[in-house]
């Protein structure tokens, strides 16, 4: 696969990556009553609770390889309801407004607002998809002895070392005072940083100005697009999707938006990392790369392949081998064939 084709495929899936942020719905899976959490689990849970329950406003940088993008986030919690505004400061303007589980994605260049229910996956400074105990089944947790400094705040270093090669490792730094996640680094099997997100300026607590929750854009007259999401059982439709060790299925939906062809989506998670599979009709005006194969942008690896009349995209924050394994596991047997 040529470098140009690889780059084109990665770029063509950027919308899907953004869809994971603003257009993906999931309810948290029902979990059995868990035993009392360990001290490490409580520390990870504190990070998650801080992201949801604290008032904070700041600018963070997201680095993937040689590229970097900055964003501004403002989050407030009144004891019952969350409100959040996230604004991309580089590249094409893009803004996310959230009130509890509803997310609006503002696209000023198209004068459009995309509306959908929030995904189960929290973005930075959130951390986990599932509970801390689920995460610890697949990662060894170690706590650093010395504090570090991020955004002019002391933070505690926590390292999550994967127990197998199917997932990345992580090095976190959580605010020693509030528990808020200040930096997360994604680590390769060689312990190299392949991606990181870190605050570069931050306010926490009463100093947060709630006026910063207001959108920059006047959206009167903008087109509002609501994505229709319907639960679907892909096995009943003839699809088989393999799950890497430790990953489990947390989402299966068919999504419809405007007059575009329906897209089926499966989301797998180990409690921290997530892998999404998108299944859409091949052709019919859809733009797909001329070549299949893997591509990468930072820690996010992506594999695209054609399967009969469908195009399959698998992407997620997992090593290339894991993403390729999922892509290779996907098969389809039409209903007529399965009856014989």
Predicted regions, residues:
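Extended beta-strand-rich segments in extracellular/periplasmic secretory proteins, especially
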Residues: 129-187, 192, 221-266
């Amino acid at each position: 696969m040529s470098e140009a084709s690889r780059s084109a495929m990665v770029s063509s899936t950027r919308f899907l990556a953004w869809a994971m942020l603003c257009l993906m719905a999931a309810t948290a899976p029902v979990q059995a009553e868990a035993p009392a959490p360990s001290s490490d689990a409580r520390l990870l849970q504190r990070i998650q609770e801080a992201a949801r329950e604290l008032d904070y406003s700041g600018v963070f940088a997201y680095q993937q390889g040689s590229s970097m993008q900055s964003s501004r986030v403002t989050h407030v919690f009144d004891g019952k309801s969350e409100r959040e505004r996230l604004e991309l400061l580089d590249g094409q303007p893009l803004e996310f407004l959230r009130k509890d589980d509803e997310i609006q994605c503002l696209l000023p260049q198209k004068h459009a607002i995309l509306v959908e229910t929030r995904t189960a996956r929290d973005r930075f400074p959130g951390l986990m998809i599932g509970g801390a105990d689920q995460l610890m089944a697949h990662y060894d947790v170690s706590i650093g002895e010395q504090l570090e400094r991020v955004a002019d705040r002391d933070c505690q270093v926590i390292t999550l070392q994967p127990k197998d090669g199917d997932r990345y490792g992580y090095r976190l730094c959580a605010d020693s005072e509030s528990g808020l996640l200040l930096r997360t680094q994604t680590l390769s099997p060689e312990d190299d940083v392949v991606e990181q997100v870190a605050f570069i300026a931050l306010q926490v607590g009463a100093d947060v100005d709630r006026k910063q929750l207001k959108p920059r854009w006047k959206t009167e007259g903008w087109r509002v697009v609501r994505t229709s999401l319907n639960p679907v059982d892909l096995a009943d439709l003839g699809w088989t999707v393999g799950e890497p060790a430790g990953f489990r299925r947390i989402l299966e939906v068919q999504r419809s938006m405007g007059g575009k062809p329906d897209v089926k989506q499966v989301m797998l998670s180990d409690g921290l990392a997530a892998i999404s599979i998108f299944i859409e009709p091949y052709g019919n005006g859809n733009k797909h790369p001329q070549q299949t194969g893997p591509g990468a942008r930072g820690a996010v690896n992506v594999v695209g392949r054609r399967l009969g009349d469908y195009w399959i995209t698998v992407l997620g924050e997992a090593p290339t081998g894991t993403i390729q394994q999922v892509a290779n596991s996907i098969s389809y047997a039409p209903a007529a064939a399965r009856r014989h």
